[in-house]
Design a protein with these regions (language model features):
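Juxtamembrane/transmembrane-helix interface segments of polytopic membrane transporters
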Residues: 98, 102, 106, 189-198, ...
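Transmembrane alpha-helix/helix-exit interface in multi-pass inner-membrane proteins
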Residues: 91-115, 144, 148-152
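Membrane-interface alpha-helices at helix entry/exit sites of multi-pass transporters
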Residues: 80-86, 167-175
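Alpha-helical transmembrane segments and their lipid-water interface positions
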Residues: 41, 45, 94-98, 151-155, ...
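Hydrophobic transmembrane alpha-helices
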Residues: 2-88, 92-93
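Alpha-helical transmembrane segments and their cytosolic interface
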Residues: 11, 167-172, 183-190, 202-251
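Alpha-helical membrane-spanning segments of integral membrane proteins, especially the hydrophobic core
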Residues: 87, 123-144, 173-177
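Membrane-interface interhelical connector segments
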Residues: 101-135
Length: 251
């Protein structure tokens, strides 16, 4: 007997239809951005004021939200959620592969010094970088799940409120949803990881979540004309017309 929690055939068909419709590079770039931001998050940026905690992951974190905004604009909120959670599953698979690789015996090429000797401390540090910590993986996964749902919902609500279809509206819905969702993402991670494991205060968590979200939002602002242009190309080429007719326009 099928469990009540199992996806219905219609939901599975919806997921399959969108993944068939979605340009392959969108999902590939989304997955790549998740992998890259998690690896780069291991490098904290120095020379910053005490109220700003930022890691190198911000160079890629905006990409995922920009792709969701583009997808929601063209294919709808449900499609944005499917894109996000599919990418999250692939990311977890890659995290597992990285963890397995860290357990393999051997030395990283970067652990060798000028004399050709492998330095155990550096080799162990590289293994740990790719292996990650269970609480960091858990926290980042919960954070991106929550912030993705939040981003896509806010994006749609802002679009309904503005009622127009131009770059100004696209930028507004993207900037508002991304700014708030990045804050939610950062704060969720801080509540799960930074406060209990690194001893942050709640004030530190909120302040750094807000300032970090601003830095990440600025990256999307810079590239928003490009993402808007891509959406317009999709519309001109009627990309996903059959999907829209079946799942969006029919509602």
């Amino acid at each position: 007997m099928m469990s009540s929690s199992s996806p219905s055939p219609s939901k599975l068909s919806h997921i399959a239809d969108f993944l068939h419709t979605c340009p392959a590079w969108v999902l590939a770039l989304f997955v790549g951005s998740l992998v890259a931001m998690n690896l780069l998050a291991n490098k904290s940026l120095g020379g910053l004021p005490s109220w700003l905690a930022l890691d190198a992951g911000f160079l890629f974190s905006w990409v995922a939200f920009a792709l969701m905004d583009m997808t929601v604009k063209r294919f709808g909120e449900a499609a944005g959620n499917i894109l996000a959670f599919t990418a999250i599953v692939f990311n977890l698979f890659i995290v597992l592969i990285f963890f397995m690789a860290s357990l393999l015996p051997g030395e990283w090429s970067a652990s060798y010094d000028a004399a050709g000797q492998s330095l155990p401390a550096i080799n162990a540090a590289l293994d740990q970088t790719f292996a990650g910590s269970w609480y960091v993986v858990f926290g980042s996964t919960v954070a991106i799940c929550v912030s993705s749902l939040f981003n896509n919902r806010v994006n749609v609500l802002v679009a309904r409120w503005l009622h127009r279809d131009n770059f100004g509206v696209y930028a507004s819905r993207s900037f508002i949803s991304t700014g708030l969702a990045q804050f939610v993402d950062n704060l969720t991670f801080a509540l799960i990881v930074s406060i209990p494991f690194f001893g942050w205060s709640l004030l530190q968590a909120v302040t750094c979540a807000a300032t970090g979200a601003l830095a990440e939002l600025l990256m999307e602002v810079v590239f928003s004309p490009v993402s808007y242009r891509i959406v317009r190309i999709w519309e001109a080429r009627q990309t996903g017309a059959a999907y829209l007719e079946k799942y969006v326009e029919a509602r």
